[in-house]
UniProtKB/Swiss-Prot annotation:
GO terms for cellular component: eukaryotic 43S preinitiation complex; eukaryotic 48S preinitiation complex; eukaryotic translation initiation factor 3 complex, eIF3m. Component of the eukaryotic translation initiation factor 3 (eIF-3) complex, which is involved in protein synthesis of a specialized repertoire of mRNAs and, together with other initiation factors, stimulates binding of mRNA and methionyl-tRNAi to the 40S ribosome. The eIF-3 complex specifically targets and initiates translation of a subset of mRNAs involved in cell proliferation. Residues 392-401, 423-432 have a biased composition (Basic and acidic residues). It holds the Pfam family PCI. This is Eukaryotic translation initiation factor 3 subunit M. It comes from Pyricularia oryzae (strain 70-15 / ATCC MYA-4617 / FGSC 8958).
């Protein structure tokens, strides 16, 4: 947008005085507004109109949108829209008494319109968007795809509004609360991580603050308790989360188990810290299932050299009966941790590929070894192809020589045959 950008509502036309008087009529305060307009006290007139604007929530439903459009237009065309918009937004979060059925949607539409009418880099958008987020929670509105789409742009918006880290966390906190209340756990989790990234990674005092540690704990609990979250590299990479190893060592130990250890380690943890899982309101059944899937993945990663795991190894590591191996193999494949198939005949799981839980020095060595094997295989294949190509070329050349020789021989025979015929005719002529 250019600096000359001016917001404009459709179907709103007229001078300030004319439009202000129209608004005053709707609010039934014309007697108070007209003297101010006559005295050219437009700012005072607008302040009075905005202060009375809560009455718009009680006007007939069919007039609601038009009236609010007019009010918003007056405010946006004024010298101080920032002064008046908070009041309007606050009014819109209140119930629309004239329309119990459609009031929430009408008000949300108006809030969204205000946001869209502001310049993209206008910091006032920050407060309007917070009101939109809160509106969803206040009125228990299901999270729309439109809002989810808007949230993808939120980091860019926050940057364009030039907000400090505290205000950025304020916004993310609002989103987290709304998403949590709506049962959108994954959305909430992702915004917890975004909030944690606003802490200065080079300032220990910042990322070890009480606020940072509480957010880190919330992220940890969310990551561990989620039935579908099977990757923990994103959360473990955050300094605020790593700092939990000092401030909340038991929590951090549990995260480490889910990040890179196995079911036996989880059992040892529960024995060592009896009652901790229950105290944290974590579902042990969900956690146990996750650890079995993660243990299967670790087993597959450790078996990449042979590319197979015996049924016995699976039953022992997962602590399951042999008849359940197929079920867990299917589950780990569906979870995207491992690709492979069962061999009922050999009683093994054949590994095609595996998603490493941790990619460290050991995994780099394994990758280097695998690449070296691939390199040797490709080199051998190229040598074979070149050898076969050379043999084919030699064979083609040999056949070409043979064909040329045969052609020359045939021509020679034809010439010799022609000479003998001519000599025979000459003898016959001489005989005569």
């Amino acid at each position: 947008m250019t600096a000359s950008y001016q917001p404009q509502l459709v179907f709103v036309d007229g001078s300030f005085a004319e439009l202000a008087q129209d608004m005053a009529s709707v609010l039934q305060i014309s007697d108070e507004i007209q003297p101010l307009l006559d005295s050219e006290k437009e700012s005072e007139a607008l302040t009075k109109i905005v202060s009375e604007s809560k009455k718009l929530n009680a006007i007939p439903e069919k007039e609601f949108t038009g009236a609010y459009n007019l009010l918003v237009h007056l405010v946006l065309q004024s010298k101080e829209p920032k002064k008046h918009l908070p009041t309007i937004c606050q009014n819109l979060t209140r119930p629309v008494t004239s329309s119990p059925q459609h009031g929430a949607q009408l008000a949300l539409f108006e809030l969204t319109s205000i946001f869209n009418l502001l310049k993209p880099n206008d910091p006032v958008r920050f407060n309007v968007f917070i009101q939109i987020i809160r509106f969803y929670k206040i009125h228990s509105i299901p999270i729309s795809d439109h809002l989810k789409s808007a949230l993808k742009q939120l980091p860019r918006w926050l940057q364009s509004w030039e907000l400090d880290e505290e205000d950025q966390r304020k916004m993310y906190s609002e989103v987290i609360e709304v998403m949590t209340a709506a049962g959108e756990e994954e959305e909430a989790y992702q915004h917890i991580l975004k909030a944690l990234r606003t802490f200065d990674s080079e300032d220990a005092e910042d990322y070890t603050s009480e606020e940072a540690q509480q957010l880190a704990l919330r992220a940890l609990r969310s990551a561990i308790s989620s039935p579908t979250r099977l990757s923990f590299e994103d959360i473990r990479a955050l300094p605020a989360v790593h700092a939990l190893s000092e401030s909340h060592p038991v929590h951090y130990q549990l995260l480490q188990i889910f990040g890179e250890q196995d079911l036996d380690d989880y059992d040892d943890f529960r024995e060592e810290h009896e009652g901790f899982i229950e105290k944290e309101n974590l579902d042990n059944e969900v956690l146990y299932r996750k650890m079995r899937l993660l243990t299967f993945a670790s087993l597959a990663a450790a078996s990449m050299q042979t590319r197979e795991i015996s049924y016995n190894s699976i039953t022992k590591a997962l602590q399951i009966p042999s008849e359940d191996v197929e079920m867990w193999a299917i589950d780990v494949i569906r979870a995207g941790l491992v690709e492979g198939k069962l061999s009922q005949k050999k009683k093994v799981f054949l590994i095609h590929s595996v998603r490493y839980r941790v990619f460290g020095e050991k995994q780099w060595r394994q990758l280097a070894s695998s690449l070296e094997k691939t390199k040797k295989t490709v080199s051998t294949l190229l040598q074979t192809l070149r050898r076969e190509e050379a043999n084919a070329q030699q064979e083609a050349e040999r056949k070409l020589v043979e064909a040329s020789t045969q052609h020359n021989n045939d021509r020679g025979n034809q010439r010799r045959g022609g000479n003998r015929g001519q000599q025979h005719r000459e003898r016959n002529d001489n005989d005569d």
